[in-house]
């Protein structure tokens, strides 16, 4: 059999040469053979201290259990190495045996496959010795090129002249085992002090803390309540810094969160105190409004008294026959009214500015102010017309006197003979205009009655009063301007007094406004009748 192209080749190792050789079948192929059998042994570890001068033993027990005992050198300290395993029968595997002396190549069948592993325990059973004739085929089978693995060894043999070199690893294994167990014990010893609470005061904790990072999380997980020595020091410093900052007012970085929390909490306290002050101010404003309602009933009475005084003075002037005295009285009253008008405008504007600064919660629009001022002016005009429109001789004479005084003050060329005709014309014109104004006021009051629920507390600005009065002045004819000049001044005085009173408080309640409008509507209905 030629085998080429191998490093090293079988022919080179066995010195077979290039010639062709015959292959013979061995005794195992004879069915009558009962003495010859070939087995293979596969082991996991080969000791270096095997004594090749002595024979090894193979013991086949029950349940296919096999025990192989290999002797060791005396200097190794271990008498022999023991292998244990099981065996299986071969079905188609064969073994080639080459004889170097004769050059004969023989083919034999394999009987059993034995696989063993090294054990630490030593066997005391007596081994059964293999025949000497089987040693040669076992060695050749181990070194042959057949399907048998190269790691097989023969149990015993003397014909080949060389025994298998088995290494003893008992001492090496034991030393490795000791090292491995020692390292495990060291790890356990290192791990236990980590979990023990007595290690908090031990000086070896920094060394333990420099272990692998895999063991550090386990230490934290097992010691959730325990902390490193540096962590309590940091928390103690934080507490000390926080207390010192709270007592001494120091701005450390550790108390930034608490300082920001306190600073953010101050606006809430300020806003709550501000709201409390506003709530306290509301009852005070309500009390002021009640006082103003009491004072509000006085302007019509004051206005009536003022008109009665004027009528008495004018009648006194007519009875005495001194028109100069009446003109002087009228001029003095006009000057006083102008002075009062200026003072009330200043007071109303000052109170309105104060109200706009002190009451930022006023949400009324200028349209509301227009409605309020118009309703107040209408109520005042209706009251004045009721007083001036009574069917009495004194009122008619007072109106004629006032018209005479007005016409006398405007033009000095008029005489006493022309006065009755002028008075009739002026009275008829004033009556028609008053009737027309009453109809307009009644329509406006009906329109404003729907808007009364929407009216709130609002300030009455003098600018709106002056605008409304200017509109009334433009609506009047030029020939009647001199006659109603005195009445308009009285209306302005009353409206400014009321607006000054209301502006000082910042507004007036809705129920008072409704009462005035109802009173004015009743008076307008009486006049229409």
Swiss-Prot record:
Is Manganese one of the keywords UniProt gives this record?
Answer: no
GO terms classed as biological process: cellular response to heat; positive regulation of DNA-templated transcription; transcription elongation by RNA polymerase II
Q: According to its record, what are the GO cellular component terms?
A: nucleoplasm; super elongation complex
Instruction: Please give the Gene Ontology molecular function terms for this protein.
Output: transcription elongation factor activity
Gene for this protein?
Answer: Eaf
Which UniProt keywords are given for this protein, alphabetically ordered? Activator, Developmental protein, Nucleus, Phosphoprotein, Transcription, Transcription regulation
Function comment: Promotes transcriptional elongation by Su(Tpl)/ELL. Essential for development.
Q: Where is the composition biased (Low complexity)?
A: 194-215, 256-265, 306-315, 327-346, 431-451, 469-480, 488-499, 510-523
Organism listed in the record: Drosophila grimshawi
* Alphabetized PANTHER family for the sequence: ELL-ASSOCIATED FACTOR EAF (PTHR15970:SF2)
Recorded hits in InterPro entries, A to Z, give: EAF_fam, Tscrpt_elong_fac_Eaf_N
Where Phosphoserine occurs, residue numbers? 196
Region of interest (Disordered), residue spans:
155-235, 253-529
* Membrane-traversing stretches: none
The family note in this entry says:
Belongs to the EAF family.
Q: Name one Pfam family in it.
A: EAF
Q: What is this protein called?
A: Ell-associated factor Eaf
Which residues fall in a compositionally biased region of kind Acidic residues?
Answer: 401-416
Bias (Polar residues) occurs at 167-186, 347-359
Where is the protein localized? Nucleus
